[in-house]
Amino acid sequence: MGRAIGIDLGTTNSCVAIMQGKDTKVIENKEGARTTPSIVALTSSGERLIGAPAKRQATTNASNTFFATKRLIGRQYSDPEMKNLSVPYKVFAAKSGDAWVKTTDNKEYSPSQIGAFILQNMKEAAEAYLGEEVKDAVITVPAYFNDSQRQATKDAGKIAGLNVLRIVNEPTAAALAYGLDKKHGHTIVVYDLGGGTFDVSILEIGDGVFEVKATNGDTHLGGEDFDNGVVSYLLDEFKKSNGIDLKNDPMAMQRIKEAAEKAKIELSSAMETEINLPFITADASGPKHLNMKLTRAKLESLVNDLIERTMAPCKKALEDAGLSASQIGEVVLVGGMTRMPKVIEKVKEFFGKDPHRGVNPDEVVAIGAAIQAGIIQGDVRDVLLLDVTPLSLGIETLGGVFTPLIERNTTIPTKKSQVFSTAEDNQTAVTIKVHQGERKLAVDNKLLGQFSLEGIPPAPRGRPQIEVTFDIDANGIAHVSAKDKATGKEQKIRIQSSGGLSDDEINRMVKEAEEKAQEDEKRKKFIEVKNQADSLVHSTEKSLTEYGDKVSPEDRSAIENAVNELKEVSKSDNIDDADSIQQKVTNLSQLSMKLGEAMYQASQQNSAENGFSSEGNPNDKEEKVVDSDYQDIDNKEENK
């Protein structure tokens, strides 16, 4: 078995880590950073940029730069959370009803594909570090992700060419990283406020056992919402001062969003910051600039309701665990937003103790994922992880009522069976709708899918005995099987969700990813050969200027023609022209050897004229070599 990596696929940033012996190592990306922005951009030339390069060009390519797509993964376009989505790129309803994204040239991508591009980047960083291919990975998700979101994340891993060993809840992974060396048992809370989601989990840890007692959260609450609060304030203030609404200006909106995020980060350590965006727009009177100061107090007032929203899940998690705040031994902060002083203050106020700050909130989840990978591969022993399902799983019963079969916070993996029957005489088929959630009515919960049991022998209603088994695996993903108790015939049933990616779609995306990897390799070769061509043209033209008169007119003409041909072919942006450019490079290199010979001969001639030869200075033969007298000071001192 090869090396397995742990990946934190975040809304704002992603991180990859690996076990090395008993230690963990966070792997740096190509830019030397330990985290990578979860941003993917498609350029007009067809190039795909990931991470910091994508973020740098977002202002000028906002409509084709996809960020925070983790908020779309596994979601239907009709979901209530989609209504308040504020992004510069196009989000639309795919045929399945899922929320997908679209470029300005109408190329369509599922959020799982965008996630796969980021996972591929993480995979490549690990392979560059290890010097070997990586196939296996543990990927983290918010604890409050439902079945569809977990499955969509697993699909992203498959599209990226990874075998997903396990889907792990982010707070649980953080607890693993925090408590691996803790021997004495105690209860901890992991408060995880990231870029797009909020989770809170309560765990009992000690002697290698990590048992999740309860979890809660909000999959649409995070740093993006804090940024949007600042953006709204800046837009309103600018409109008041200048009478111009910038909401429909994508480039201005992208600049303001970046400035808002930067200001938010700065105000975690400073009391005041200045936002200065020159030439943000223009009207008949000339260019307009956005220049205003933002204080920490103002920021806190803008986002206070968001911080307050994190308290209700904390309260619910404590209730589900049957604990009070005073019974919590440690509060571990995870996620970049937990650096905000107001968040720290609110957590301290709620739990009555200073939060633990001994972990890096940006890296701890990836480290925990790497530890889980080590556990699965047998590299980490004597550690038992007992996680829970965050949401109840059940079916729709008579009158549209939601009947839970597996309650939330049930330790996973778990299995529960229920016997169903027919509602009418001689009924030969039964349709079962599977839902996930906590609402009383099935329609208010997430419909995971539905399936039909067919071929039931005709009988009076209520007579057939159909045992349906609901199974949640260690990834938190649901499976269903059915058994006709009368005949003993058993059938495994796959839940066919109304949304999600089909096997054919996943296979197509895997193939596209492989083809794109080949195209990326071709593009890399194309860029390298163009750089080689530019360098050769520059050096050859310089040599022609200095030594062109040292070669025959015929040779000089041939070299000049070769230079012009290489210049012309190098203008191409078609990656398929790499071989043509390489041929011209080879041709010019061979012709330039004549120049090299002329340069060498000129160098030899200069040496001879200055009285030097390869044997040395001839005048040296006339001189006598005289050994100088010396005294050994140390010995002289000793002999005194």
Swiss-Prot record:
SUPFAM superfamilies: Actin-like ATPase domain, Heat shock protein 70kD (HSP70), C-terminal subdomain, Heat shock protein 70kD (HSP70), peptide-binding domain. Residues 601-617 have a biased composition (Polar residues). Residues 539-556, 618-640 have a biased composition (Basic and acidic residues). It holds the Pfam family HSP70. One of its GO terms (molecular function) is unfolded protein binding. PROSITE patterns: HSP70_1, HSP70_2, HSP70_3. The modification Phosphothreonine is found at residue 197. Gene3D superfamilies: 1.20.1270.10, 3.30.420.40, Actin, Chain A, domain 4, Substrate Binding Domain Of DNAk, Chain A, domain 1. Keywords: ATP-binding, Chaperone, Nucleotide-binding, Phosphoprotein, Stress response. Residues 537-556, 599-640 are annotated as: Disordered. Induction: By stress conditions e.g. heat shock. Disulfide bonds: none annotated. InterPro entries: ATPase_NBD, Chaperone_DnaK, Heat_shock_70_CS, HSP70_C_sf, HSP70_peptide-bd_sf, Hsp_70_fam. Belongs to the heat shock protein 70 family. Acts as a chaperone. This is Chaperone protein DnaK. It comes from Wolbachia sp. subsp. Drosophila simulans (strain wRi). The gene is dnaK.
